[in-house]
Amino acid sequence: MNNTISELAASIRSIPDYPKPGIIFRDITTLLGNPRAFRRAVDELVQPYAGTKIDKIAGMEARGFILGGAVAHQLSSGFVPIRKKGKLPHETVRIAYSLEYGVDEMEMHRDAVQPGEKVILVDDLIATGGTAVGATRLLRQIGAEVVGACFVIDLPDLGGRRKLEELGVVVHTLVEFSGH
Protein backbone atom coordinates (compact mmCIF):
# COMPACT_ATOMS: atom_id res chain seq x y z
CA MET A 1 0.00 0.00 0.00
CA ASN A 2 1.52 3.38 -0.97
CA ASN A 3 1.73 6.29 1.47
CA THR A 4 -1.29 8.13 0.07
CA ILE A 5 -3.52 5.07 0.32
CA SER A 6 -2.21 4.31 3.83
CA GLU A 7 -3.00 7.88 4.87
CA LEU A 8 -6.50 7.62 3.42
CA ALA A 9 -7.16 4.31 5.18
CA ALA A 10 -5.95 5.79 8.48
CA SER A 11 -8.30 8.77 8.07
CA ILE A 12 -11.42 6.54 7.92
CA ARG A 13 -13.03 5.82 11.28
CA SER A 14 -14.17 2.23 11.92
CA ILE A 15 -17.18 1.81 14.20
CA PRO A 16 -17.82 -1.78 15.35
CA ASP A 17 -21.34 -3.19 15.68
CA TYR A 18 -23.01 -0.35 13.76
CA PRO A 19 -25.70 -0.30 12.50
CA LYS A 20 -26.05 -3.80 13.93
CA PRO A 21 -23.89 -6.41 15.69
CA GLY A 22 -21.17 -7.93 13.52
CA ILE A 23 -20.95 -4.97 11.12
CA ILE A 24 -17.99 -2.59 11.08
CA PHE A 25 -19.20 0.77 9.77
CA ARG A 26 -16.58 2.64 7.72
CA ASP A 27 -17.17 6.32 8.47
CA ILE A 28 -15.68 8.71 5.91
CA THR A 29 -16.75 11.85 7.79
CA THR A 30 -13.32 11.83 9.42
CA LEU A 31 -11.68 11.74 5.97
CA LEU A 32 -13.95 14.57 4.78
CA GLY A 33 -13.06 16.63 7.85
CA ASN A 34 -9.33 16.30 7.18
CA PRO A 35 -8.48 18.79 4.39
CA ARG A 36 -5.34 16.93 3.30
CA ALA A 37 -7.02 13.50 3.21
CA PHE A 38 -10.13 14.85 1.46
CA ARG A 39 -8.00 16.54 -1.22
CA ARG A 40 -5.91 13.39 -1.73
CA ALA A 41 -9.00 11.19 -1.98
CA VAL A 42 -10.53 13.44 -4.65
CA ASP A 43 -7.21 13.63 -6.53
CA GLU A 44 -6.96 9.82 -6.51
CA LEU A 45 -10.58 9.37 -7.64
CA VAL A 46 -10.01 11.79 -10.55
CA GLN A 47 -6.62 10.42 -11.65
CA PRO A 48 -7.83 7.54 -13.90
CA TYR A 49 -9.99 9.99 -15.87
CA ALA A 50 -7.52 12.86 -16.27
CA GLY A 51 -7.47 14.00 -19.88
CA THR A 52 -10.67 12.09 -20.70
CA LYS A 53 -13.87 13.90 -21.64
CA ILE A 54 -16.45 12.94 -19.06
CA ASP A 55 -19.82 14.63 -19.49
CA LYS A 56 -21.38 13.92 -16.11
CA ILE A 57 -20.55 12.59 -12.69
CA ALA A 58 -23.46 10.76 -11.04
CA GLY A 59 -23.29 10.79 -7.25
CA MET A 60 -25.36 8.42 -5.19
CA GLU A 61 -27.22 9.67 -2.14
CA ALA A 62 -25.83 10.92 0.18
CA ARG A 63 -22.05 10.78 0.56
CA GLY A 64 -21.71 10.33 -3.19
CA PHE A 65 -22.98 13.90 -3.51
CA ILE A 66 -20.01 15.25 -1.56
CA LEU A 67 -17.38 13.24 -3.40
CA GLY A 68 -19.13 13.40 -6.76
CA GLY A 69 -19.42 17.17 -6.65
CA ALA A 70 -15.71 17.50 -5.95
CA VAL A 71 -14.82 15.03 -8.73
CA ALA A 72 -17.13 16.83 -11.18
CA HIS A 73 -15.47 20.13 -10.33
CA GLN A 74 -11.97 18.74 -10.93
CA LEU A 75 -12.97 17.14 -14.24
CA SER A 76 -15.03 20.17 -15.40
CA SER A 77 -18.02 17.84 -15.72
CA GLY A 78 -21.65 18.30 -14.77
CA PHE A 79 -23.02 16.67 -11.63
CA VAL A 80 -26.15 14.49 -11.43
CA PRO A 81 -27.65 13.45 -8.08
CA ILE A 82 -29.17 9.98 -7.95
CA ARG A 83 -31.67 10.07 -5.11
CA LYS A 84 -34.09 7.97 -3.16
CA LYS A 85 -37.63 7.91 -4.54
CA GLY A 86 -39.66 11.07 -4.03
CA LYS A 87 -36.81 13.53 -3.38
CA LEU A 88 -36.59 15.25 -6.78
CA PRO A 89 -39.01 18.00 -7.88
CA HIS A 90 -39.03 17.58 -11.66
CA GLU A 91 -39.92 14.72 -14.03
CA THR A 92 -37.87 11.65 -13.09
CA VAL A 93 -36.88 8.19 -14.24
CA ARG A 94 -36.88 5.52 -11.57
CA ILE A 95 -35.60 2.01 -11.04
CA ALA A 96 -36.09 -0.60 -8.32
CA TYR A 97 -32.91 -2.25 -7.07
CA SER A 98 -32.00 -5.02 -4.67
CA LEU A 99 -30.50 -4.42 -1.27
CA GLU A 100 -29.08 -6.94 1.15
CA TYR A 101 -32.46 -7.16 2.92
CA GLY A 102 -35.09 -6.07 0.41
CA VAL A 103 -35.79 -3.74 -2.49
CA ASP A 104 -35.61 0.05 -2.77
CA GLU A 105 -36.05 2.61 -5.54
CA MET A 106 -33.81 5.39 -6.81
CA GLU A 107 -34.43 8.11 -9.33
CA MET A 108 -32.90 10.99 -11.22
CA HIS A 109 -34.25 13.83 -13.31
CA ARG A 110 -35.19 12.57 -16.77
CA ASP A 111 -33.27 15.41 -18.45
CA ALA A 112 -30.12 15.23 -16.29
CA VAL A 113 -28.20 13.05 -18.75
CA GLN A 114 -28.58 12.93 -22.51
CA PRO A 115 -28.29 9.72 -24.55
CA GLY A 116 -24.66 8.97 -25.39
CA GLU A 117 -23.18 11.12 -22.62
CA LYS A 118 -20.23 9.60 -20.78
CA VAL A 119 -20.91 9.21 -17.07
CA ILE A 120 -18.88 8.09 -14.06
CA LEU A 121 -20.59 6.87 -10.88
CA VAL A 122 -19.13 8.11 -7.60
CA ASP A 123 -19.87 6.98 -4.05
CA ASP A 124 -18.02 6.61 -0.79
CA LEU A 125 -18.19 2.82 -0.57
CA ILE A 126 -19.07 -0.30 -2.53
CA ALA A 127 -20.23 -3.30 -0.53
CA THR A 128 -22.80 -5.66 -2.08
CA GLY A 129 -23.09 -3.44 -5.16
CA GLY A 130 -26.88 -3.16 -5.10
CA THR A 131 -26.96 0.64 -5.23
CA ALA A 132 -24.20 0.93 -7.85
CA VAL A 133 -25.73 -1.75 -10.07
CA GLY A 134 -29.12 -0.02 -9.77
CA ALA A 135 -27.57 3.35 -10.66
CA THR A 136 -25.79 1.82 -13.66
CA ARG A 137 -29.03 0.32 -14.93
CA LEU A 138 -30.88 3.60 -14.36
CA LEU A 139 -28.30 5.57 -16.35
CA ARG A 140 -28.26 3.02 -19.16
CA GLN A 141 -32.06 3.05 -19.24
CA ILE A 142 -31.90 6.68 -20.44
CA GLY A 143 -29.04 6.03 -22.87
CA ALA A 144 -25.99 7.13 -20.87
CA GLU A 145 -22.64 5.42 -21.36
CA VAL A 146 -21.37 4.45 -17.90
CA VAL A 147 -17.61 4.57 -18.48
CA GLY A 148 -16.55 3.93 -14.91
CA ALA A 149 -17.34 3.91 -11.22
CA CYS A 150 -15.11 5.07 -8.40
CA PHE A 151 -15.34 4.59 -4.67
CA VAL A 152 -13.12 5.54 -1.75
CA ILE A 153 -13.76 2.20 -0.02
CA ASP A 154 -14.23 -1.34 -1.35
CA LEU A 155 -15.44 -4.17 0.87
CA PRO A 156 -14.30 -6.96 -1.50
CA ASP A 157 -15.68 -9.79 0.63
CA LEU A 158 -19.20 -8.60 -0.25
CA GLY A 159 -18.68 -8.84 -4.03
CA GLY A 160 -20.05 -5.50 -5.23
CA ARG A 161 -17.08 -4.67 -7.42
CA ARG A 162 -17.42 -7.98 -9.25
CA LYS A 163 -21.13 -7.34 -9.92
CA LEU A 164 -20.35 -3.98 -11.52
CA GLU A 165 -17.50 -5.42 -13.56
CA GLU A 166 -19.87 -8.15 -14.83
CA LEU A 167 -21.95 -5.28 -16.27
CA GLY A 168 -18.86 -4.02 -18.10
CA VAL A 169 -18.19 -1.11 -15.73
CA VAL A 170 -14.54 -0.31 -14.98
CA VAL A 171 -14.25 0.09 -11.20
CA HIS A 172 -11.66 2.22 -9.42
CA THR A 173 -11.33 2.07 -5.62
CA LEU A 174 -8.80 3.54 -3.21
CA VAL A 175 -8.93 1.55 0.04
CA GLU A 176 -10.00 -2.04 0.77
CA PHE A 177 -11.26 -3.28 4.11
CA SER A 178 -11.95 -6.97 4.70
CA GLY A 179 -15.15 -8.19 6.30
CA HIS A 180 -18.52 -6.48 6.42
From Swiss-Prot:
UniProt subunit comment: Homodimer.
Gene Ontology biological-process entries: adenine salvage; AMP salvage; purine ribonucleoside salvage
Gene Ontology molecular function: adenine binding; adenine phosphoribosyltransferase activity; AMP binding
Pfam families: Pribosyltran (PF00156)
Family per similarity comment: Belongs to the purine/pyrimidine phosphoribosyltransferase family.
Keyword Ribosomal protein: no
Reactions catalysed, as given in the entry: AMP + diphosphate = 5-phospho-alpha-D-ribose 1-diphosphate + adenine
GO cellular component term of the entry, any: cytoplasm
Name of protein: Adenine phosphoribosyltransferase
Functional summary from the UniProt entry: Catalyzes a salvage reaction resulting in the formation of AMP, that is energically less costly than de novo synthesis.
SUPFAM superfamilies noted in UniProt: PRTase-like (SSF53271)
EC numbers: 2.4.2.7
Pathway(s) of this molecule: Purine metabolism; AMP biosynthesis via salvage pathway; AMP from adenine: step 1/1
Keyword vocabulary terms for this entry: Cytoplasm, Glycosyltransferase, Purine salvage, Transferase
UniProt subcellular location: Cytoplasm
Source organism phylogeny: Bacteria, Pseudomonadati, Pseudomonadota, Alphaproteobacteria, Hyphomicrobiales
CDD domains, alphabetized: PRTases_typeI
InterPro entries, per database record: Ade_phspho_trans (IPR005764), PRibTrfase_dom (IPR000836), PRTase-like (IPR029057), UPRTase/APRTase (IPR050054)
Enzyme class, broadest EC rank: transferase
